[in-house]
């Protein structure tokens, strides 16, 4: 009797651990998806500010490189 109770408790503990682990994997994949979508939106906003290859962006210290605004390049160089 004691052995069967112990096995039931161990089984419940194993199921709990497995469910908790699968929930964290699902949350990580959701977080990865959201980060990818937000990063894509930031990239699209940067492209929208560009007027063309090496054109000036709305900010005076930004310029376009391959249609992406960047703060680390000088236009025309």
UniProtKB/Swiss-Prot annotation:
Top-level division of the source organism's lineage: Eukaryota
UniProt keyword rRNA processing present: no
Principal location class: secreted
Cysteine-cysteine disulfides: 50-64, 57-69, 63-75
Localization, UniProt: Secreted
Keywords: Amidation, Disulfide bond, Ion channel impairing toxin, Knottin, Secreted, Signal, Toxin
GO cellular component terms given for this protein: extracellular region
GO molecular function: ion channel regulator activity; toxin activity
Propeptide feature: residues: 22-49
Extent of the signal sequence: 1-21
Tissue expression notes: Expressed by the venom gland.
Domain description: The presence of a 'disulfide through disulfide knot' structurally defines this protein as a knottin.
Family listed: Belongs to the neurotoxin 10 (Hwtx-1) family. 65 (Jztx-21) subfamily.
Protein task: Probable ion channel inhibitor.
Protein name according to UniProt: U14-theraphotoxin-Cg1a 1
């Amino acid at each position: 009797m004691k052995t069967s109770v112990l096995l039931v408790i161990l089984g419940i503990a194993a199921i709990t651990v497995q469910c908790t682990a699968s929930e964290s994997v699902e949350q990580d994949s959701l977080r990865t998806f959201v980060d990818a979508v937000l990063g894509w939106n930031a990239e699209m906003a940067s492209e929208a500010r560009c007027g063309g290859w090496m054109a000036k962006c709305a900010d005076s210290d930004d310029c376009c490189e391959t249609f992406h605004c960047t703060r680390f390049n000088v236009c025309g160089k």
